[in-house]
Structures are given as C-alpha cells and as structure tokens.
Amino acid sequence: MAAPAAGPVFWRRLLGLLPGRPGLAALLGRLSDRLGRSRERRRRRSPWLLLAPLLSPTVPQVTSPPCCLCPEGVHRFQWIRNLVPEFGVSSSHVRVLSSPAEFFELMKGQIKIAKRRVVMASLYLGTGPLEQELVDCLESSLEKSLQAKFPSDLKVSILLDFTRGSRGRKNSRTMLLPLLQRFPERVRVSLFHTPNLRGLLRLLIPERFNETIGLQHIKVYLFDNNVILSGANLSDSYFTNRQDRYVFLQDCAEIADFFTELVDAVGDVSLQLQGDDTVEVVDGMVHPYKGDRAAYCRAANKRVMDVIHSARARQQMLHAQTFHSDSLLSQEEAAAAGDRRPAPDTWIYPLIQMKPFEIQIDEIVTETLLTEAERGAKVFLTTGYFNLTQAYMDLVLGTRAEYQILLASPEVNGFFGAKGVAGAIPAAYVHIERQFYSEVCSLGQQDRVQLQEYWRRGWTFHAKGLWLYLAGSSLPCLTLIGSPNFGYRSVHRDLEAQIAIVTESRSLQQQLHQEQEQLYLRSGVVTSATFEQPGRQVKLWVKMVTPLIKNFF
C-alpha cells in the first residue's frame, strides 16, 4: 500500500506550500482524495455500469484521507478544510433541537437578549400572528437598545428571497416595513433576486411560479455569537407542525462572524428594501435582472468567495497558533496563561452552494462523502422533497455503504392538498420515488438501499441532511444540516448553505443519533406494496410531465 499512498502524500504536502492560493489548494486536496482509486471505482460513476458492484466481490479501494496524513491526527474528514474554513469548538457548545416549538421559542428568547447583532436569512417571513411575534420581539429589542442606561449598538440584518417575499398584497416586505421606517439606521432588509429570472421570462411567468427559476434558500438565524442552522423558514407551520432539523451553536464567535459576513455578502448583491416599499441596488453593484448577467454573477462570486477565503485564512492562522501547532501549550500551561477555552472535540465546516455564481462547494463535499462511504458504513439521508440529482443517485446505487433514505409520504408533503397544478406535485414525487425504488430492485440492492416514508397525523415534513456512521460504529461521527435538499434545485438553481459537523464527542454523537432515531421512528419501510395503496396511483399526465419539470422542484 506504500506506493499507492505516495501520490496522495505528495499532493497533501504541496498544500502546505500554498497558503495564499486557496483555490489551487482546494483543487490539489480534491485530487489527493481521488488518487489511487481502482479502475472499477472510476467506472462506477457511469449509469451504464451500475451493475459493476454486483459482478465483483472485491471491495473497491478507497483513499479517504487517513489520519496518518493529518499531522495532528484529529479526524478523517480534515480534507474539507482545503475548501472552507474549519472551526474547532467544544461539543458543549452544540445543542441539537428537536421540535418546531423549541426552535420558535429559542429564536424569540435569543432576539430578546441580543445586544450587538441579529442576522436572519430565510426564504421568506410569513404573515401570521406567530411571525408578527418575531417582528415584535425585534422591535422591542431595538427599542430597548436605544433606551437602555448604557445603549447598545444593536443592528438587525434580514435576508429573504425577492420573489417569495413579495408574493401577495400582504407579504414579507410589508411585515418588515415598520421596522425599516422606525429604525432606518439599524435595520437592513435585503431581497435576493436570481439573475436567471429576467427579460421576457420575468414578464411572462406567473407570480406563483416565478420562484421555480431560482431562490435565496439559506436558513441561518444568528444572535450575537449564537447561531441556529436549520432548513426551517420563518413561517407559522415551521413553528408548530412542520418537522425540520435545527442545531444551536452557542458562544461560537468565529462561526457567527463567518455567517454574518456571508449574509452581508449576499445582501450586498441583493436589492435593498426601502421604507416606502421600493427597492434599490447597492451603490456600484450590477442590477441582478436589469444589468449584464455575466458581470453580476462575477461580482457575486467574488463577493462570496472573498468571505470564504478570508475566513479560511483566519482559521488557518488561528489553528497554527493553537490547536495544530507542534509547540502547543499543555492544557495546564494554557489555563495558567488565562486561556480557559476547552480543547475542541468537534469541527464545523460551512458548505456553500451557489451554482448561478459558479460556487459548488457543498456539491463537491457531498459527492465526496457519498463516494468515500465504505462497506459497513451507514448513511441516513433525509429530504422533504425526494428528487436526488442523477450524480447523487448514481453514488447511492454505486457505492458499498448501507443507505436508509427518509422522505415525506404524500400526506405530509408540503404541497399536499394545494390548489391547481401545485396539487399534483406530491404525485410527481411519488412517481420519482417509484422509479428510484424500481432501479434499486432491478439492481438487487433492496438490502443495502432502503426507502422510508415519514408520516405524522396533522404534520408536514421538511427535514433534510444526513448522518454518517462509520463501519462498526453505532453512533454517527458526521452530520450535514442546513438548507439543501439534495435535489436539482439545491445543486443548480438556489443559494444554499449547510454545515458539516464532525465530532469525536460521545455525548454529541448521542444527540445526533437520538435526532436521527426520532425522525425515523415515525416512518414506514417502502416496499412494492406501498405503491399499490389507494392514492398512490399517478395519473398519466403527471408521469409525462414530471421529467420535464423535475429540475424546477
């Protein structure tokens, strides 16, 4: 094995010589992870050769970055830091939430005690009484910051999608106008407009469907140095009976700074809501749908990548001085010097996907994780909308890990019971699910790849992400949590962000395991009989239309 390992070692050593070239370093890191794969491994990516795993009993050779290639030997996923900043934290600062009500109450509580910043990125803000409670909390905190004996400099920044946030007479914009009008120097509302919705298309496509072209889909809720990453939007159902996932990162200043800068960057290339309900472009910025598309996308790419590169450089410098230095002080010496920060046992990696701006970090990392999942590993993958990209489907079908995929039953799909064409969307998902299940069966992989449908009376399902259990382990060491759904839209159309959490902490692993179990306990295994149930018969027109529209949802 020494010879095959020589290539990856060589490339990895080159990374240390490229501190000022993160893009090239990331590319070399990617290459090093790919070197040494067998010919069979490379061929398996082809959809024509999905039978290869069935024809050969040998285990494909995988070159996951082993601990011996990482000087500090922390974990096998350190290759991700070749692409994005790595944040080392104590697991005691990470809390997994379980319910919409817990998510809602935590947000309100955090807004009330925020002193410096509140940053919220979401698809939209709803217009009901619960959403009004959030707005009232923001108003109260801003008011207190002005009237306090020692006034604070509290600033509020909100990033939403333009099309979704402008729909209807009463909408996200009208909900936030009072804040803008009362605190114009302290409140910023940015509305992202995809550069792909422009010209004649923008004029002709109906309001209800214009969001299919592309969206701001990032869900980050940040209060001073505390951050909630989720897939949940700011709407009443997400506070009551729409199941999602949520993780709370407490007292994580570097992570909070990163996501503040990311939201600021996207905000700078978005339209700015004014107190009279008009919108304006930031001075010097190309207009997203009136200006030159290529120039706008280049500017947006630079703005976002500057955030990623600068944060990555900061973290590399911090790690060189602390966790990753050969001259690292002992814990006793550090405590004596006044540094009481606990040693990290958990690592956070922000994964950004903005294909319109040619940023595809999340896609690269997700594909690599699926590719490197070895025989004996278990991957629990969940999505509220089962519409995997072809690349993800090929990897699920072509690798050796066990997969349990959790998806929404038609009754808990967010479009169930909708009026008009949208009411047929659950049936389209059933059709996609059945096609995938048929492919699993045709390859004889029912024991390795299992589909499960979530069902809960009176609830809908919106959870997404994955949990990775290494071979021989009963607890997950990695999870992905955030906004991506693993579908075409998430990869190609929308702006997405999630985090990879890698942990050696048994207590945090147990939290993640319990989260996974709670979701999967409310599911049933999909079999051929599932598609014979009443209500699962898909109309012919839906079957015919689905291939044409599946890239839009």
Swiss-Prot record:
GO MF, one example: hydrolase activity, acting on ester bonds
Entry keyword annotation includes Transit peptide: yes
This protein's pathway: Phospholipid metabolism; phosphatidylglycerol biosynthesis; phosphatidylglycerol from CDP-diacylglycerol: step 1/2
A GO cellular component entry from the record: mitochondrion
Catalytic site positions: H217, K219, D224
Location in or out of the cell: Mitochondrion
Tissue-wise expression: Widely expressed with higher expression in testis, liver and brain.
Group of enzyme by EC: transferase
CDD domains: PLDc_PGS1_euk_1, PLDc_PGS1_euk_2
Keywords: ATP-binding, Lipid biosynthesis, Lipid metabolism, Mitochondrion, Nucleotide-binding, Phospholipid biosynthesis, Phospholipid metabolism, Phosphoprotein, Repeat, Transferase, Transit peptide
Binding, ATP: A121, S122, L123, Y124, L125, G126, T127, G128
EC number in record: 2.7.8.5
Catalytic reactions on record: a CDP-1,2-diacyl-sn-glycerol + sn-glycerol 3-phosphate = a 1,2-diacyl-sn-glycero-3-phospho-(1'-sn-glycero-3'-phosphate) + CMP + H(+)
Superkingdom per UniProt: Eukaryota
Modified residues (Phosphoserine): S46
Modes of activity regulation: Activated by calcium and magnesium and inhibited by other bivalent cations.
Ranges annotated as spanning the membrane: none
GO annotation, biological process: cardiolipin biosynthetic process; diacylglycerol metabolic process; phosphatidylglycerol biosynthetic process; phospholipid biosynthetic process
Residue range covered by the transit peptide: 1-25
Residue ranges occupied by any PLD phosphodiesterase domain in the UniProt entry: 212-238, 457-490
Keyword Amino-acid biosynthesis: no
Function: Functions in the biosynthesis of the anionic phospholipids phosphatidylglycerol and cardiolipin.
Similarity remark: Belongs to the CDP-alcohol phosphatidyltransferase class-II family.
Protein name per its UniProtKB record: CDP-diacylglycerol--glycerol-3-phosphate 3-phosphatidyltransferase, mitochondrial
